[in-house]
Amino acid sequence: MPLIRRYLHRYAKAGSAAEVVLLSKTRTEAPGGSQMTGLQAHLEDLVIANRILAHENVVDGFGHISLRHPERPDRFLMSRSRSPELVTLDDIMEFDLDCNPIDQRGRVMYGERAIHGAIFQARADVNSVVHNHAHEIIPYSVTKTPMRQVIHTAGGMGAHVPVWDIRDDFGDTDMLVRNLQQGRSLAKALGDNAAVLMRGHGVSVVGRSVRDAVRIAVYLMVNARLQTEATRFGDVTFLSEGEIAKTAEMSGSPLASDRIWEYWARRSGYVSDKTKA
């Protein structure tokens, strides 16, 4: 039985409700009062991440987030094909890096999981990938205007956000990344950056953790909106390379990361103080 299925089996035996009861910031207690394992805590974060991305309007009915398996780096975890706001623990599936399901059990899979598998193959430093279609970002994927950091809280987006055009390598398509060949082309365009725009489609964002990827995805969208608004007033003063580096370090610190995660998780409505140890 796959590791994730063994955990979900234990979760069900604990008698928890069908709805996920997400844990507090400490995330040390599992359903039924037992101590959580590292895998359990990561799975909880993945569910919370889906809810946060939906609540913060980074995703709507479409979009997805993945997690490299914390105990099997040659695999990754993500929901079955479902709108992020509705994702629960029972929806989480396990895949190898070629995007084959380990334990499908008849569940429908995201058609663009190749985005995640290809990036995990190319980037050993990446442990989470967010793909979204935030409207604020799209204009920067279809014009020659580069997206650049204008606000300190967007630390981590990097000095360069490349644009990938699927038509360059694959001609006319439906714009979706449907196979690993297309996914690897996208991963090549991403390079060692934190995000890659996808012409007329959206963006893929990477992070060292689920929390890291969510934070960058949210503030990349915010930065795009502010950059667009700022250009209406004239020339824009962007952050310097030094400021970009220092704000990335600040935003990615445990203090800042935990603080914003707790805030977003509570806003999404799926954190319960009753589960605190």
Predicted regions and their residues:
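Segments surrounding the PLD/"HKD" phosphodiesterase catalytic module and close analogs
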Residues: 12
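Glycine-rich flexible loops
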Residues: 9, 21-277
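Compositionally biased, low-complexity intrinsically disordered regions
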Residues: 15-16
